């Protein structure tokens, strides 16, 4: 049955506007799979980028799933980050080869607003497409966390200009 927005309007306009904006943002993000590449020695940068979105997704009634290789999330960190402790689920010590499959299954269920998984290798186009399709089906967001070591980055010559001066010779 269709009813107009006017007939269903609420007397508290700001709340209705806020809810509509939140729903629009959540729907726009659904089906999104994004890779976050960060330096292992600077994990806080990735957290600073993701926490606002994770807080917003935490307002949904669904879970947030963290598939972590070794680290265990501390209750204190989850609470101090503003994430809903009662909606955060973690599976730790997951073998890297199982992370992709677990992400696809979790995204597809629709039980999670966001699924975050750590990958050591880059995904193929086919693997990425499978994640995107699962996120669309489950109306969820997926984040692939990809740590890189500073010494693993390809070495290149620094761009710069060497200025010789006969004043110093």
UniProtKB/Swiss-Prot annotation:
- Keywords attached to this entry: Cell cycle, Cell division, DNA damage, Septation, SOS response
For this protein, the record's SUPFAM superfamilies field holds:
P-loop containing nucleoside triphosphate hydrolases
- Region annotated FtsZ binding sits at 106-112
Site annotated as Essential for degradation by Lon protease: where? 169
A GO BP term, please? SOS response
Identify one Pfam family in the record: SulA
- Where are the annotated segments for Lon protease binding? 162-169
Induction statement: By DNA damage, as part of the SOS response.
Q: Which domain of life is it from?
A: Bacteria
Post-translational modification here is noted as: Is rapidly cleaved and degraded by the Lon protease once DNA damage is repaired.
Q: What does this protein do?
A: Component of the SOS system and an inhibitor of cell division. Accumulation of SulA causes rapid cessation of cell division and the appearance of long, non-septate filaments. In the presence of GTP, binds a polymerization-competent form of FtsZ in a 1:1 ratio, thus inhibiting FtsZ polymerization and therefore preventing it from participating in the assembly of the Z ring. This mechanism prevents the premature segregation of damaged DNA to daughter cells during cell division.
Please give the subunit comment from the record: Interacts with FtsZ.
Stored NCBIfam families? PRK10595.1 (NF007892), SOS_SulA_coli (TIGR00623)
Q: Into which family does the record put it?
A: Belongs to the SulA family.
Q: What is this protein called?
A: Cell division inhibitor SulA
Q: From what organism does this protein derive?
A: Salmonella paratyphi C (strain RKS4594)
């Amino acid at each position: 049955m269709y009813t107009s927005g006017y007939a269903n309007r609420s007397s508290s306009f700001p709340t209705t506007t806020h809810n509509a904006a939140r729903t629009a943002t959540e729907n726009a993000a659904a089906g999104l799979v994004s890779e976050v590449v960060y330096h292992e020695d600077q994990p806080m940068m990735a957290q600073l980028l993701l926490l606002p979105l994770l807080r917003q997704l935490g307002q949904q009634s669904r879970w947030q799933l963290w598939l972590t290789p070794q680290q265990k999330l501390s209750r204190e960190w989850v609470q101090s980050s503003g994430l809903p402790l009662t909606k955060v689920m973690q599976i730790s010590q997951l073998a890297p080869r199982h992370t992709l499959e677990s992400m696809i299954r979790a995204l597809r269920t629709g039980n999670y607003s966001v699924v975050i998984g750590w990958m050591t290798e880059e995904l193929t186009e086919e693997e990425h497409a499978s994640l995107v399709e699962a996120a669309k089906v489950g109306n969820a967001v997926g984040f692939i966390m990809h740590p890189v070591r500073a010494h693993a980055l390809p070495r290149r010559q620094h761009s710069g200009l060497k200025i010789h001066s006969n004043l110093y010779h």
